[in-house]
């Protein structure tokens, strides 16, 4: 009877573990993410400047922690459209670097430089992390861009 109870418990445990859901992050190259979001539908302000995250001045102090990443920005300096996606081994350091950028460099946009759309983009900006990925979006349609990023990495 004990053997039967042990076997039943083992089968039940394996069944529950096998049926449980885990939310894993896919290991996708950030270049694939960039290709999916770098279009006129999601990035409405064209043309767009593309920069490797390791070469972008915001990440100067954390570039050794960056595995790969990109920065997309509007080439028109009075329109705010920033999209950063970085794969890193130190999420908190990269998030802090972006937070510093947001506080220091985006202040003029938050104060209304370039129009009300820019102030709204700063107020509605998104700085999040999922697994080893960190993304920052300050753009008129940040929610749509975020949805595309999450669709790809989850």
Predicted segments with their positions:
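A short, solvent-exposed beta-edge/loop patch
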Residues: 117-154
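C-terminal motif of bacterial Sec signal peptides marking the signal peptidase cleavage site
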Residues: 15-18
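Short, compositionally biased low-complexity segments enriched in polar/charged residues
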Residues: 48-80, 93-94
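Second-shell loop/turn segments in exported
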Residues: 81-89, 133-138
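Positively charged n-region of N-terminal signal peptides that target proteins for export
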Residues: 1-5
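Post-signal peptide N-terminal segment of mature Sec-exported envelope proteins
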Residues: 26-46
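Short Gly/Thr-rich strand-loop-strand
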Residues: 91-131
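Bacterial signal peptide processing site
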Residues: 20-23
């Amino acid at each position: 009877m004990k053997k039967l109870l042990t076997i039943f418990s083992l089968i039940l445990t394996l069944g529950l573990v096998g049926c449980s859901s885990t939310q894993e992050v896919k290991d996708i190259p950030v270049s694939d993410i960039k290709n999916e979001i770098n279009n006129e539908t999601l990035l409405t302000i064209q043309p767009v400047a593309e920069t490797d995250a390791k070469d972008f001045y915001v990440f100067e102090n954390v570039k050794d922690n960056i595995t790969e990443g990109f920065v997309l920005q509007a080439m028109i300096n009075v329109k705010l459209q920033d999209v950063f996606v970085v794969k890193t081994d130190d999420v908190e350091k990269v998030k802090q670097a972006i937070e510093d950028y947001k506080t220091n460099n985006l202040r003029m946009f938050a104060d209304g430089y370039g129009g009300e759309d820019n102030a709204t983009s700063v107020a509605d900006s998104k700085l999040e992390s999922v697994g080893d990925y960190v993304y920052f979006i300050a753009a008129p349609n940040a929610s749509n861009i975020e949805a595309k990023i999450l669709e790809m990495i989850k």
